[in-house]
C-alpha cells in the first residue's frame, strides 16, 4: 500500500468532533492540513483557543490494497514492553503504538519468495502520541494531541502532529522488512562512540550498596574484561542518593559520601563510571523545589513543561558530568509524568481532567523536550540510557533504549518472559532508533546457572549491550570463565542475531546467529511455574 491521503479525517476537540473527506478541514477555529511530499504524509493542526484532543485518519482498503491471503500483524509498545510483544491475527480493537507490520508467511524457514510485509508508521519524534488499528476493511491512525488529559491550546501556532509513511517490502523476511522500516521511520540514530557493556549493581543489590561495594564491583568487572578491545562500564543504580528512588541528586547518602571521588576511583581501574537518576520524582518535596514546579494531579512529581524544572534537570545532568560520570541512566519518567508504566498504558496515554503547566504544547512535545534537555546538558561524550522512556520520542536523543520491563535476579520466569521477548521483538530497532538494551543478567544464586547462563549467552551474542548484575563471590571458576567469555564477545558487538520462530512464539527458541541456526531451550528445567501471572 502506498502512502496516500486518508478517506476520512476526524478532528476531536473538547467541544465536539467533525469528520471530513479532504486534505483540509476546519471545526470552529481548529484546522487540519494533510500534505503529501516525498512519499510522506504530513499531518498538521492549528487553532487559536479551541482545545484540540485527537486527530483520526482512516484509510479504507481498495480491492488492490486489501490483503487476500492470511496475514499476521505486529504492533509495537509505547515505551518498554511487558513480555507481550507478538504477531497476532487481525484484532480490530488492538492498539499498536507508533507502527504496525502486516506480513504473510513465516520467518521460521527463512523462505523469501512470495513474502510481502507492509509497514504503517510515523517518523520518530512526532508531535503527537500515535497508535494504529488494523481491520479487514482498512487501517486507522489515532493521533493524541492532548496536553496531559486536556486538549492542547495551540494559541495560533501550527503543530506538526506526525509524518506518516506506508511501505511495502517484498521477497524478504518480516524481520528484514521490520529493520528496513525502522530505518525509514528514524530521523537519525545517535550511535554510541564505542560498544556499551559492563556491570550494573541493581539486580543483585536492589538498592543496598556502598562506595566500597561499587569499587569492588568495578574491580571485578575490570578483571573479567582485561584485554578486551573496549572498556566496560560500571553503572551505579538506585541506592546512592539521600532517599531511595528519590532525590535530591546533588550528593550521595552516608554509604556514598563522595560521588565525584567514586567516579574517579572507578576510572582509575580502567572502567567507565555510570550513574542512575530519576529526574521527575520529588516525593515529599525532598528536593527543595518550588511548589509550582510539580504536576497538578500529583505533587510528588515534577512538571517537565515548566521552564524551571527543565533548568533544574539540565543542572542536575551537568553535575553528573562534572562529577566524572560518562554514562547516565535516567529512569521511571513515563510513569512519573503520566501516572502509569508504559506497558500498562491502554489506548490513551493519560487520564482525562488534568493538564501541564504549559498548556500550549502536546504531551509528546513536552516529553520530547524533557529528553532533549537531558541530551543537551549531557553533551556529546556522555552516553544516555533511556529507561522507561517513550520509544519513538527518545529515538535519536539517547544512545541506548531499555526496551523491556525489568528482569529479576530472583525469578527465572520474569527474566525469561520480559528479557527474551523484548530482545526478539525490539531487535529490529537496534541501530535504527538507538542501541537496544534488553536489560541485565541478574546473577544472585537464586536462579540456577543452567537458566541464567542461557540469558547471559544470548545477550552476549546478540550484538546489543550486555550488562551483568553479579553478586560477588558466588560463581565457580567455570562460571567466571563463561562470564569472561561473554564480556569478551560483547565488548565488540559484531554478532548478528535474528529470531526465527518469532511469528509463532513470543519467547523464540530458534535464532540465526551470523547465518547459523542455534537453539535455546528456555523451559528445559521446570524450576518454577507461572500460574495466573504469579510464580508458584
Tell where the protein language model's regions lie, with residue ranges.
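Carbohydrate-recognition beta-sandwich/jelly-roll modules
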Residues: 2-232, 327
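Aromatic- and carboxylate-enriched substrate-binding clefts and catalytic-loop regions
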Residues: 230-445, 451, 479, 484
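Short strand-loop junctions, especially beta-strand C-caps/beta-turns
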Residues: 202-204, 239, 446, 471
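Short coil/turn segments at secondary-structure boundaries
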Residues: 438, 470-475, 498-502
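Hydrophobic targeting/anchoring helices
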Residues: 156, 162, 456-459, 466
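Carbohydrate-binding surface patches
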Residues: 38-39, 459-463, 467, 500-536
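Glycine-rich, acidic and aromatic/proline-enriched surface loops and short helix-turn segments
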Residues: 220-223, 227, 241, 281-282, ...
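Catalytic cores of secreted or luminal carbohydrate-active enzymes
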Residues: 458-494
Amino acid at each position: 500500500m502506498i502512502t496516500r491521503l486518508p478517506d476520512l479525517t476526524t478532528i476531536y476537540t473538547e467541544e465536539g468532533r467533525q469528520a471530513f473527506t479532504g486534505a483540509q478541514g476546519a471545526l470552529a477555529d481548529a484546522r487540519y492540513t494533510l500534505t503529501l511530499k516525498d512519499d510522506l504524509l504530513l499531518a498538521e493542526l492549528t487553532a487559536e483557543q479551541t482545545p484540540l484532543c485527537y486527530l483520526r485518519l482512516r484509510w479504507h482498503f481498495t480491492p488492490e490494497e486489501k490483503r487476500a491471503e492470511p496475514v499476521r500483524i505486529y504492533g509495537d509498545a509505547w515505551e518498554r514492553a511487558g513480555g507481550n510483544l507478538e504477531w497476532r491475527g487481525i484484532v480490530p480493537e488492538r492498539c499498536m503504538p507508533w507502527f504496525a507490520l502486516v506480513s504473510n508467511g513465516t520467518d521460521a524457514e527463512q523462505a523469501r519468495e512470495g513474502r510481502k510485509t507492509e509497514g504503517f508508521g510515523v517518523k520518530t519524534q512526532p508531535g503527537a502520541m500515535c497508535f494504529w488499528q488494523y481491520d479487514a476493511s482498512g487501517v486507522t491512525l489515532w493521533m493524541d494531541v492532548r496536553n496531559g488529559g486536556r486538549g492542547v491550546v495551540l494559541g495560533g501556532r501550527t503543530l506538526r502532529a506526525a509524518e506518516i509513511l506506508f511501505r511495502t517490502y517484498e521477497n524478504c523476511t518480516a524481520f528484514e522488512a521490520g529493520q528496513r522500516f525502522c530505518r525509514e521511520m528514524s530521523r537519525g540514530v545517535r550511535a554510541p562512540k564505542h560498544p556499551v557493556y559492563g556491570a550494573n549493581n541493581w539486580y543483585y543489590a536492589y538498592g543496598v550498596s556502598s562506595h566500597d561495594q561499587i569499587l569492588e564491583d568495578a574491580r571485578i568487572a575490570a578483571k573479567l574484561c582485561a584485554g578486551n578491545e573496549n572498556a566496560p562500564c560500571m553503572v551505579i543504580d538506585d541506592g546512592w542518593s539521600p532517599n531511595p528512588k528519590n532525590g535530591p541528586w546533588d550528593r550521595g547518602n552516608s554509604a556514598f559520601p563522595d560521588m565525584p571521588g567514586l567516579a574517579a576511583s572507578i576510572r582509575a581501574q580502567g572502567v567507565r563510571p555510570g550513574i542512575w537518576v530519576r529526574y521527575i520524582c520529588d516525593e515529599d518535596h525532598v528536593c527543595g523545589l518550588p511548589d509550582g514546579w510539580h504536576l497538578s494531579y500529583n505533587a510528588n512529581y515534577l512538571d517537565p513543561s515548566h521552564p524551571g524544572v527543565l533548568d533544574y534537570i539540565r543542572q542536575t545532568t551537568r553535575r553528573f558530568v562534572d562529577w566524572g560520570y560518562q554514562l547516565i541512566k535516567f529512569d521511571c519518567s513515563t510513569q512519573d509524568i503520566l501516572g502509569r508504566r508504559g506497558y500498562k498504558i491502554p489506548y490513551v496515554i493519560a487520564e482525562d481532567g488534568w493538564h501541564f503547566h504549559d498548556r500550549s504544547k502536546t504531551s509528546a512535545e513536552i516529553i520530547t523536550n524533557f529528553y532533549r534537555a537531558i541530551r543537551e546538558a549531557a553533551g556529546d561524550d556522555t552516553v544516555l540510557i533511556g529507561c522507561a522512556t517513550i520509544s519513538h520520542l527518545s529515538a535519536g536523543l539517547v544512545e541506548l533504549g531499555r526496551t523491556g520491563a525489568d528482569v529479576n535476579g530472583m525469578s527465572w520466569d520474569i527474566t525469561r518472559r520480559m528479557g527474551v521477548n523484548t530482545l526478539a521483538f525490539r531487535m529490529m530497532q537496534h541501530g535504527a532508533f538507538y542501541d537496544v538494551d534488553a536489560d541485565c543478567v541478574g546473577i544472585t544464586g537464586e536462579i540456577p546457572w543452567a537458566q541464567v547462563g542461557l540469558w547471559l549467552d544470548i545477550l552476549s551474542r546478540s550484538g546489543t549491550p550486555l550488562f551483568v548484575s553479579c553478586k560477588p563471590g558466588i560463581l565457580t571458576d567455570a562460571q567466571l570463565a563463561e562470564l569472561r567469555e561473554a564480556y569478551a564477545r560483547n565488548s565488540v558487538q559484531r554478532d548478528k542475531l535474528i529470531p526465527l520462530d518469532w511469528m509463532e512464539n513470543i519467547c523464540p527458541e530458534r535464532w540465526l546467529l551470523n547465518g547459523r541456526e542455534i537453539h535455546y531451550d528456555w523451559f528445559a528445567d521446570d524450576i518454577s511455574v507461572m500460574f495466573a501471572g504469579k510464580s508458584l
